[in-house]
Amino acid sequence: MESQQLHQNPHSLHGSAYASVTSKEVSSNQDPLAVSASNLPEFDRDSTKVNSQQETTPGTSAVPENHHHVSPQPASVPPPQNGQYQQHGMMTPNKAMASNWAHYQQPSMMTCSHYQTSPAYYQPDPHYPLPQYIPPLSTSSPDPIDSQDQHSEVPQAKTKVRNNVLPPHTLTSEENFYTWVKFYIRFLKNSNLGDIIPNDQGEIKRQMTYEEHAYIYNTFQAFAPFHLLPTWVKQILEINYADILTVLCKSVSKMQTNNQELKDWIALANLEYDGSTSADTFEITVSTIIQRLKENNINVSDRLACQLILKGLSGDFKYLRNQYRTKTNMKLSQLFAEIQLIYDENKIMNLNKPSQYKQHSEYKNVSRTSPNTTNTKVTTRNYHRTNSSKPRAAKAHNIATSSKFSRVNNDHINESTVSSQYLSDDNELSLRPATERI
């Protein structure tokens, strides 16, 4: 009878035997993993089912599933949301363990030994969509490291949660990366994260928390697909795929370089020279602008540079426009040499003009200086005084006496006229009346 029952229902016998054996082993060994499946969390139960269905061996395939025993298998890890980052080889497991970040995992799965991440940022469900545009948390961290750094120079997170932040647009091409970075930085500032973004010198006002780091990584990965990033950004992320702040810092520096290129072009197009400064200074200024553009892979030909310089010449240098108007092979060095020649000629002429004026003024001073005086600064207008020159009082006295004497002379003239008439009657002679010499 027993043999017939064994042939009729062999699976039930093996199942009961397996159950009895496992139950004895559990009771004897007191395996901590031998707990009831009903006591496991829901997500552990799901992960166990997935692993039990995928990983089956020939020895256990014929044995029915035992709900009283759970084998110690690792939990399944969900793949990252953005597959492009994984396909391009982000970070090896050894580097990930060394940097204390999980390998290819979502920010919610990143390991942090001293920090308990708040469940408000992520859910334990692996199918939970990331990122959720939740503002970075600013709660105080129970991390003892944070308590030690309370008096450090870089303060910790003290921001407030800011809701309803408009997310940035998605990057569409590699050429628009710098424009996208501007919007992404504005998005972080609107999320109260402006104080953890490095400035132009690479300095930050405070250290970011774990949640803020995860939030930045999460949003950057969501809105900037890996295959649309520039090559230098990919190189940084291949070394450390979570180092987003370095990418932002270098992006800002490169944007400033682009702004400098624009400023150099504007300065080169608006060149002006009239000889007020030295020709050497003008040449150094123009050469520096051209060299800076060349370092940024922008070559300025000699013909273009000469045309821009000639356009801004004025004064004595303006005639060079007509000289170079018909030239096809313009050399920048030759143009600088001719500008230097004109500048030197004008300088010599300006030096000679003051010397001639100085000699002329000295001649005038000598002609107006008295030869008897020792002080050359004391000049007299008429240093050759004639003997007939008299003071004003003497002149006034002479005028008064001359007027008085004129009346006497008039009387005498009248008398002499009468006498002359008498003589003319007698002798027919006319004599000149006698006058006194003054």
UniProtKB/Swiss-Prot annotation:
Residues 1-11, 19-39, 49-60 have a biased composition (Polar residues). Residues 1-88, 364-397, 419-438 are annotated as: Disordered. The record marks H397, N398 as: Cleavage. GO terms for molecular function: RNA binding. Coiled coil: none annotated. Keywords: Cytoplasm, RNA-binding, Transposable element. Residues 369-381 have a biased composition (Low complexity). The keyword RNA-binding applies. One of its GO terms (biological process) is viral translational frameshifting. GO terms for cellular component: cytoplasm. It comes from the Eukaryota. Residues 295-397 are annotated as: RNA-binding. Pfam families: TYA (PF01021). Its main location: cytoplasm. It is found in: Cytoplasm. Retrotransposons are mobile genetic entities that are able to replicate via an RNA intermediate and a reverse transcription step. In contrast to retroviruses, retrotransposons are non-infectious, lack an envelope and remain intracellular. Ty2 retrotransposons belong to the copia elements (pseudoviridae). The C-terminal RNA-binding region of CA is sufficient for all its nucleocapsid-like chaperone activities. Homotrimer. Capsid protein (CA) is the structural component of the virus-like particle (VLP), forming the shell that encapsulates the retrotransposons dimeric RNA genome. The particles are assembled from trimer-clustered units and there are holes in the capsid shells that allow for the diffusion of macromolecules. CA also has nucleocapsid-like chaperone activity, promoting primer tRNA(i)-Met annealing to the multipartite primer-binding site (PBS), dimerization of Ty2 RNA and initiation of reverse transcription. This is Transposon Ty2-B Gag polyprotein. It comes from Saccharomyces cerevisiae (strain ATCC 204508 / S288c) (Baker's yeast). The lineage of its organism: Eukaryota, Fungi, Dikarya, Ascomycota, Saccharomycotina. The gene is TY2A-B.
